């Protein structure tokens, strides 16, 4: 009888261990999924709004809602990138007035909102559009549906206050701080970091232009990409966790 109870007790203990292990694994999986869901959303409206400033009606910031190739596959598996809508942001108030619409379109199309913090002028962009148009006509290309947007993308900061985008693909703040230090030590020496915005899997440093040769001193760190006229992420809330392999 003693052996029976001993065997029965050991069996219960083993079952309890099994249940505990399964429960622990279940909560681990739930935690991983929850972290992934949290990582799929970025809302930088309030951070970016303070950088929107124009001195006249002829100036704007280019904002586009885009479905990026890594967020969907269409046409038999071929990757495609689509611009859902473009906005010409003239003030922080105008950005605020469009916030719900922008968020709604991003949610509806599983898309991302990007904004270029190099301020544009309608005059400069219009002149660039004429230049592009002349080239298209010369080559008998009459597809001009995105002419103005293309011209805006090829036009720099209208006020001379250029900003660069440094894309760091890690959430490790020690790495981010080291890159900030390297950039500030680059010529011209001084504080060049304008702001830092979170992305899905890292950060965008917005900086003043610097000598890129100093980047070799960060070769042992997480690699970065430097862009002199690229947009930063304004809003994204991806629905599909398969798309979390991100590089903005």
Q: PLM features: what roles do these ranges have?
A:
Residues 217-225:
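C-terminal, non-catalytic extensions of nucleic-acid polymerases
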Residues 10-12, 28-29:
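Short, positively charged and aromatic/hydrophobic N-terminal segments
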Residues 33-199, 210, 216-218, 230-248:
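Signature for HUH/AEP ssDNA processing cores
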Residues 25:
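Cationic, low-complexity basic patches in intrinsically disordered or flexible, solvent-exposed regions
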Residues 206-208:
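Short hydrophobic/aromatic beta-strand micro-patches
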């Amino acid at each position: 009888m003693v052996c029976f109870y001993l065997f029965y007790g050991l069996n219960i203990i083993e079952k309890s261990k099994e249940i505990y292990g399964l429960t622990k694994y279940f909560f681990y999986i739930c935690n991983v999924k929850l972290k992934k869901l949290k990582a799929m959303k970025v809302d930088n409206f309030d951070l970016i709004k303070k950088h929107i400033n124009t001195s006249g009606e002829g100036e704007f910031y280019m904002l586009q809602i885009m479905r990026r190739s890594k967020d969907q596959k269409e046409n038999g598996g071929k990757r495609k990138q689509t611009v859902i809508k473009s906005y010409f942001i003239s003030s922080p108030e105008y950005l605020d007035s469009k916030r719900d619409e922008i968020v709604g379109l991003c949610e509806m199309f599983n898309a991302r909102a990007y904004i270029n913090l190099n301020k544009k002028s309608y005059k400069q962009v219009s002149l660039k559009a004429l230049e592009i148009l002349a080239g298209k006509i010369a080559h008998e290309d009459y597809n001009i549906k995105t002419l103005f947007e293309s011209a805006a993308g090829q036009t720099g900061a209208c006020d001379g206050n250029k900003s660069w985008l440094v894309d760091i693909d890690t959430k490790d703040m020690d790495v981010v701080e080291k890159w900030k230090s390297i950039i500030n030590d680059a010529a011209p020496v001084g504080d060049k970091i304008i702001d830092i915005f979170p992305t899905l899997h890292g950060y965008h440093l917005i900086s003043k232009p610097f000598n890129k040769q100093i980047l070799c001193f960060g070769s042992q760190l997480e690699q970065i990409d430097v862009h002199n006229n690229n947009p930063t992420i304004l809003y994204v809330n991806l629905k599909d966790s398969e798309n979390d392999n991100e590089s903005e």
